[in-house]
Protein backbone atom coordinates (compact mmCIF):
# COMPACT_ATOMS: atom_id res chain seq x y z
CA UNK A 1 0.00 0.00 0.00
CA UNK A 2 1.37 3.42 -0.97
CA UNK A 3 2.35 5.66 1.91
CA UNK A 4 0.78 9.00 1.04
CA UNK A 5 1.63 12.42 2.41
CA UNK A 6 -1.59 13.04 4.27
CA UNK A 7 -0.48 16.41 5.57
CA UNK A 8 0.11 17.62 2.01
CA UNK A 9 -3.25 16.21 0.93
CA UNK A 10 -4.96 18.16 3.72
CA UNK A 11 -2.85 21.27 3.11
CA UNK A 12 -1.61 21.39 6.71
CA UNK A 13 1.67 21.03 8.58
CA UNK A 14 2.71 18.02 10.69
CA UNK A 15 2.85 20.38 13.67
CA UNK A 16 -0.74 21.61 13.25
CA UNK A 17 -3.24 20.68 15.94
CA UNK A 18 -6.41 18.63 15.45
CA UNK A 19 -8.63 21.72 15.26
CA UNK A 20 -6.63 23.08 12.31
CA UNK A 21 -6.71 19.71 10.55
CA UNK A 22 -10.44 19.38 11.14
CA UNK A 23 -11.05 22.82 9.64
CA UNK A 24 -9.01 21.85 6.58
CA UNK A 25 -10.90 18.58 6.25
CA UNK A 26 -14.29 20.28 6.29
CA UNK A 27 -13.17 22.81 3.70
CA UNK A 28 -11.76 20.17 1.36
CA UNK A 29 -14.66 17.75 1.85
CA UNK A 30 -17.05 20.48 0.80
CA UNK A 31 -14.81 21.58 -2.09
CA UNK A 32 -14.48 18.09 -3.60
CA UNK A 33 -17.90 16.69 -2.72
CA UNK A 34 -19.21 15.02 -5.92
CA UNK A 35 -22.53 16.86 -5.67
CA UNK A 36 -20.82 20.24 -5.42
CA UNK A 37 -17.55 20.09 -7.34
CA UNK A 38 -17.43 20.16 -11.13
CA UNK A 39 -13.83 18.92 -11.30
CA UNK A 40 -13.44 15.57 -13.12
CA UNK A 41 -11.37 14.03 -10.30
CA UNK A 42 -13.60 15.35 -7.50
CA UNK A 43 -14.74 11.93 -6.29
CA UNK A 44 -11.18 10.58 -6.11
CA UNK A 45 -9.96 13.70 -4.30
CA UNK A 46 -12.92 13.51 -1.91
CA UNK A 47 -12.05 9.91 -0.98
CA UNK A 48 -8.37 10.79 -0.62
CA UNK A 49 -9.22 13.60 1.80
CA UNK A 50 -11.49 11.27 3.78
CA UNK A 51 -8.68 8.70 3.97
CA UNK A 52 -6.25 11.31 5.27
CA UNK A 53 -8.76 12.51 7.86
CA UNK A 54 -9.36 8.95 9.05
CA UNK A 55 -5.71 8.68 10.05
CA UNK A 56 -4.89 12.21 11.20
CA UNK A 57 -8.03 12.56 13.34
CA UNK A 58 -7.02 9.61 15.54
CA UNK A 59 -4.18 10.34 17.96
CA UNK A 60 -2.72 6.81 17.96
CA UNK A 61 -3.00 6.31 14.20
CA UNK A 62 -1.46 9.70 13.60
CA UNK A 63 1.52 8.90 15.85
CA UNK A 64 2.14 5.59 14.05
CA UNK A 65 1.79 7.28 10.68
CA UNK A 66 4.23 10.04 11.67
CA UNK A 67 6.83 7.45 12.68
CA UNK A 68 6.39 5.59 9.39
CA UNK A 69 6.62 8.80 7.39
CA UNK A 70 9.80 9.81 9.21
CA UNK A 71 11.51 6.54 8.19
CA UNK A 72 10.01 6.25 4.71
CA UNK A 73 13.39 6.82 2.97
CA UNK A 74 15.35 4.56 5.32
CA UNK A 75 16.80 1.59 3.33
CA UNK A 76 16.06 -0.60 6.30
CA UNK A 77 12.43 0.60 6.46
CA UNK A 78 10.95 -2.26 4.47
CA UNK A 79 12.91 -4.91 6.38
CA UNK A 80 13.05 -3.70 9.92
CA UNK A 81 11.08 -0.99 11.66
CA UNK A 82 11.64 0.22 15.20
CA UNK A 83 8.67 0.42 17.59
CA UNK A 84 8.67 2.95 20.38
CA UNK A 85 9.45 0.21 22.91
CA UNK A 86 12.60 -0.92 21.07
CA UNK A 87 10.97 -4.06 19.64
CA UNK A 88 11.55 -4.72 15.95
CA UNK A 89 9.70 -6.75 13.37
CA UNK A 90 10.49 -8.12 9.94
CA UNK A 91 9.24 -7.35 6.46
CA UNK A 92 6.50 -9.98 6.58
CA UNK A 93 4.89 -7.91 9.34
CA UNK A 94 4.95 -4.78 7.21
CA UNK A 95 1.28 -5.06 6.21
CA UNK A 96 0.32 -5.18 9.87
CA UNK A 97 1.63 -1.65 10.28
CA UNK A 98 -0.89 -0.43 7.75
CA UNK A 99 -3.65 -2.49 9.31
CA UNK A 100 -3.01 -0.89 12.69
CA UNK A 101 -3.28 2.55 11.14
CA UNK A 102 -5.92 2.18 8.47
CA UNK A 103 -8.01 -0.64 9.90
CA UNK A 104 -9.05 -3.84 8.17
CA UNK A 105 -9.31 -2.28 4.73
CA UNK A 106 -5.61 -1.34 4.58
CA UNK A 107 -4.70 -4.54 2.74
CA UNK A 108 -8.14 -5.16 1.29
CA UNK A 109 -9.09 -1.72 -0.01
CA UNK A 110 -9.53 -3.11 -3.48
CA UNK A 111 -11.81 -5.86 -2.20
CA UNK A 112 -14.16 -3.52 -0.35
CA UNK A 113 -17.67 -3.89 -1.75
CA UNK A 114 -19.44 -1.02 -3.43
CA UNK A 115 -21.74 0.63 -0.92
CA UNK A 116 -24.93 2.47 -1.79
CA UNK A 117 -25.30 6.00 -0.44
CA UNK A 118 -27.83 6.97 2.20
CA UNK A 119 -31.41 7.96 1.36
CA UNK A 120 -32.67 11.36 2.48
CA UNK A 121 -36.27 12.12 3.37
CA UNK A 122 -37.80 15.61 3.50
CA UNK A 123 -41.36 16.82 3.97
CA UNK A 124 -42.94 19.00 1.30
CA UNK A 125 -46.05 21.04 2.13
CA UNK A 126 -48.62 21.21 -0.69
CA UNK A 127 -51.80 23.29 -0.75
CA UNK A 128 -55.05 21.63 -1.78
CA UNK A 129 -55.34 23.88 -4.82
CA UNK A 130 -51.90 22.70 -5.99
CA UNK A 131 -53.00 19.06 -6.10
CA UNK A 132 -55.28 19.69 -9.08
CA UNK A 133 -52.47 20.08 -11.62
CA UNK A 134 -48.78 19.25 -11.97
CA UNK A 135 -46.66 22.11 -10.69
CA UNK A 136 -42.99 22.97 -10.33
CA UNK A 137 -41.38 23.48 -6.96
CA UNK A 138 -37.92 24.57 -5.83
CA UNK A 139 -36.83 22.57 -2.80
CA UNK A 140 -33.80 23.01 -0.57
CA UNK A 141 -32.27 20.42 1.72
CA UNK A 142 -29.00 19.57 3.42
CA UNK A 143 -26.82 16.80 2.02
CA UNK A 144 -24.88 15.15 4.87
CA UNK A 145 -21.18 14.43 4.41
CA UNK A 146 -20.00 11.36 6.32
CA UNK A 147 -16.47 10.93 7.60
CA UNK A 148 -14.50 7.72 7.56
CA UNK A 149 -16.20 6.60 10.77
CA UNK A 150 -19.72 6.89 9.37
CA UNK A 151 -20.53 10.05 11.33
CA UNK A 152 -21.99 13.20 9.81
CA UNK A 153 -19.13 15.67 9.58
CA UNK A 154 -21.00 18.51 7.90
CA UNK A 155 -24.06 19.25 5.78
CA UNK A 156 -23.98 20.81 2.33
CA UNK A 157 -27.01 22.90 1.23
CA UNK A 158 -28.53 21.71 -2.04
CA UNK A 159 -31.36 23.05 -4.20
CA UNK A 160 -33.41 21.17 -6.80
CA UNK A 161 -36.20 22.11 -9.19
CA UNK A 162 -38.77 19.31 -9.10
CA UNK A 163 -42.21 18.54 -10.49
CA UNK A 164 -45.02 17.65 -8.10
CA UNK A 165 -47.55 15.54 -10.04
CA UNK A 166 -51.27 16.22 -9.99
CA UNK A 167 -53.33 14.22 -7.54
CA UNK A 168 -50.73 13.80 -4.81
CA UNK A 169 -52.13 12.74 -1.46
CA UNK A 170 -51.18 13.30 2.13
CA UNK A 171 -48.26 11.06 3.13
CA UNK A 172 -47.45 10.10 -0.47
CA UNK A 173 -43.72 9.54 -1.14
CA UNK A 174 -42.05 10.73 -4.34
CA UNK A 175 -38.65 9.26 -5.20
CA UNK A 176 -35.88 11.32 -6.80
CA UNK A 177 -33.32 8.74 -7.83
CA UNK A 178 -29.68 9.42 -7.07
CA UNK A 179 -30.24 12.67 -5.18
CA UNK A 180 -29.22 11.25 -1.80
CA UNK A 181 -25.68 10.94 -0.46
CA UNK A 182 -22.92 9.59 -2.76
CA UNK A 183 -22.08 5.90 -2.75
CA UNK A 184 -18.69 4.52 -1.79
CA UNK A 185 -16.24 2.49 -3.90
CA UNK A 186 -18.30 2.97 -7.03
CA UNK A 187 -21.63 2.27 -5.34
CA UNK A 188 -24.76 4.13 -6.47
CA UNK A 189 -25.99 7.29 -4.81
CA UNK A 190 -28.86 7.13 -2.36
CA UNK A 191 -32.26 8.58 -3.23
CA UNK A 192 -34.15 11.65 -2.11
CA UNK A 193 -37.71 10.99 -0.94
CA UNK A 194 -40.27 13.79 -0.89
CA UNK A 195 -43.01 13.10 1.66
CA UNK A 196 -46.13 15.07 0.75
CA UNK A 197 -47.95 16.91 3.52
CA UNK A 198 -51.26 18.44 2.47
CA UNK A 199 -51.59 21.73 4.31
CA UNK A 200 -54.87 22.19 6.24
CA UNK A 201 -57.43 24.31 4.37
CA UNK A 202 -59.61 26.89 6.15
CA UNK A 203 -62.76 25.79 4.28
CA UNK A 204 -62.38 22.24 3.02
CA UNK A 205 -62.00 18.92 4.84
CA UNK A 206 -60.62 15.87 3.01
CA UNK A 207 -62.64 12.64 3.07
CA UNK A 208 -60.83 10.18 0.81
CA UNK A 209 -61.05 11.68 -2.67
CA UNK A 210 -63.98 13.89 -1.67
CA UNK A 211 -64.08 17.30 -0.07
CA UNK A 212 -66.53 18.66 2.48
CA UNK A 213 -67.39 22.29 3.05
CA UNK A 214 -69.77 23.73 5.65
CA UNK A 215 -72.25 26.13 4.04
CA UNK A 216 -74.07 28.55 6.37
CA UNK A 217 -77.72 29.21 5.40
CA UNK A 218 -80.49 31.23 7.01
CA UNK A 219 -83.66 29.57 8.36
CA UNK A 220 -85.74 30.96 5.51
CA UNK A 221 -83.22 29.79 2.88
CA UNK A 222 -83.45 26.30 4.34
CA UNK A 223 -87.24 26.47 4.52
CA UNK A 224 -88.00 28.11 1.18
CA UNK A 225 -84.98 27.05 -0.87
CA UNK A 226 -82.34 29.32 -2.35
CA UNK A 227 -79.31 29.60 -4.59
CA UNK A 228 -76.07 30.44 -2.77
CA UNK A 229 -72.52 31.00 -3.98
CA UNK A 230 -70.13 28.28 -2.79
CA UNK A 231 -66.33 28.19 -3.37
CA UNK A 232 -64.56 25.15 -4.85
CA UNK A 233 -60.84 24.54 -5.36
CA UNK A 234 -61.05 26.03 -8.86
CA UNK A 235 -63.84 28.58 -8.88
CA UNK A 236 -67.11 29.54 -7.19
CA UNK A 237 -70.36 27.82 -8.17
CA UNK A 238 -74.06 28.51 -7.60
CA UNK A 239 -75.45 25.82 -5.29
CA UNK A 240 -79.18 25.11 -5.18
CA UNK A 241 -80.60 24.71 -1.66
CA UNK A 242 -83.83 22.69 -1.96
CA UNK A 243 -86.89 23.79 0.07
CA UNK A 244 -87.21 22.11 3.45
CA UNK A 245 -83.47 21.49 3.84
CA UNK A 246 -82.24 20.39 7.25
CA UNK A 247 -79.17 21.28 9.29
CA UNK A 248 -76.37 18.79 8.56
CA UNK A 249 -77.85 17.81 5.20
CA UNK A 250 -75.15 16.99 2.61
CA UNK A 251 -75.58 18.22 -0.94
CA UNK A 252 -73.34 16.58 -3.54
CA UNK A 253 -71.53 18.57 -6.22
CA UNK A 254 -70.13 16.03 -8.66
CA UNK A 255 -66.53 16.27 -9.87
CA UNK A 256 -65.44 19.10 -7.60
CA UNK A 257 -63.33 17.03 -5.22
CA UNK A 258 -59.71 15.90 -5.39
CA UNK A 259 -58.04 14.71 -8.59
CA UNK A 260 -56.20 11.39 -8.93
CA UNK A 261 -55.01 9.22 -11.81
CA UNK A 262 -58.05 6.96 -11.48
CA UNK A 263 -60.88 9.33 -10.59
CA UNK A 264 -62.03 12.76 -9.50
CA UNK A 265 -63.83 13.06 -6.20
CA UNK A 266 -66.92 15.07 -5.34
CA UNK A 267 -67.62 18.09 -3.17
CA UNK A 268 -70.19 17.76 -0.39
CA UNK A 269 -71.82 20.92 0.95
CA UNK A 270 -72.90 20.37 4.56
CA UNK A 271 -75.68 22.79 5.52
CA UNK A 272 -75.45 24.77 8.73
CA UNK A 273 -78.54 26.77 9.67
CA UNK A 274 -77.53 30.05 11.26
CA UNK A 275 -80.05 32.00 13.32
CA UNK A 276 -80.18 35.79 13.07
CA UNK A 277 -79.25 37.95 16.09
CA UNK A 278 -81.70 38.53 18.94
CA UNK A 279 -84.89 39.79 17.26
CA UNK A 280 -86.39 43.19 17.82
CA UNK A 281 -90.07 43.62 18.65
CA UNK A 282 -91.29 43.49 15.04
CA UNK A 283 -89.15 40.48 14.14
CA UNK A 284 -90.24 38.67 17.28
CA UNK A 285 -93.85 39.19 16.27
CA UNK A 286 -93.15 37.61 12.89
CA UNK A 287 -91.48 34.62 14.54
CA UNK A 288 -94.53 34.28 16.76
CA UNK A 289 -96.82 34.27 13.73
CA UNK A 290 -94.72 31.47 12.25
CA UNK A 291 -94.89 29.53 15.51
CA UNK A 292 -98.66 29.90 15.63
CA UNK A 293 -98.98 28.76 12.02
CA UNK A 294 -96.85 25.68 12.75
CA UNK A 295 -98.26 24.92 16.19
CA UNK A 296 -98.73 21.24 15.32
CA UNK A 297 -95.05 20.79 14.49
CA UNK A 298 -93.04 19.09 17.25
CA UNK A 299 -89.29 18.91 16.48
CA UNK A 300 -88.80 16.52 19.44
CA UNK A 301 -91.54 14.09 18.47
CA UNK A 302 -89.14 11.21 17.81
CA UNK A 303 -86.40 12.43 20.11
CA UNK A 304 -84.85 9.65 22.18
CA UNK A 305 -86.76 6.90 20.40
CA UNK A 306 -84.89 3.95 18.96
From Swiss-Prot:
Any Pfam family: DnaJ
Annotated compartments: Cytoplasm, Nucleoid
Assigned keywords, A-Z: Chaperone, Cytoplasm, DNA-binding
Listed GO biological process terms: chaperone cofactor-dependent protein refolding; protein refolding
UniProt cross-references to InterPro entries, sorted A to Z: DNA-bd_curved-DNA, DnaJ_C, DnaJ_domain, DnaJ_domain_CS, HSP40/DnaJ_pept-bd, J_dom_sf
Every J domain range: 5-69
NCBIfam families in the cross-refs: PRK10266.1
Functional note: DNA-binding protein that preferentially recognizes a curved DNA sequence. It is probably a functional analog of DnaJ; displays overlapping activities with DnaJ, but functions under different conditions, probably acting as a molecular chaperone in an adaptive response to environmental stresses other than heat shock. Lacks autonomous chaperone activity; binds native substrates and targets them for recognition by DnaK. Its activity is inhibited by the binding of CbpM.
PANTHER family, per the entry: DNAJ HOMOLOG 1, MITOCHONDRIAL-RELATED
Protein name as it appears in the record: Curved DNA-binding protein
Organism: Escherichia coli O17:K52:H18 (strain UMN026 / ExPEC)
Lineage, uppermost ranks: Bacteria, Pseudomonadati, Pseudomonadota, Gammaproteobacteria, Enterobacterales
Gene this chain is encoded by: cbpA
Amino acid sequence: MELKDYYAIMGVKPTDDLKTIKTAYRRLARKYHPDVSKEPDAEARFKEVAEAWEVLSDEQRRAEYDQMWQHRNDPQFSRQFQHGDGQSFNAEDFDDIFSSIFGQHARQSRQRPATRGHDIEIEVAVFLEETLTEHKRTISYNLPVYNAFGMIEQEIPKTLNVKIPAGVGNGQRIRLKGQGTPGENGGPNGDLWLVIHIAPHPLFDIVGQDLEIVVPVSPWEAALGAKVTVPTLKESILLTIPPGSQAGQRLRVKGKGLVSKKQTGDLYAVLKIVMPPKPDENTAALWQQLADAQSSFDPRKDWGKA
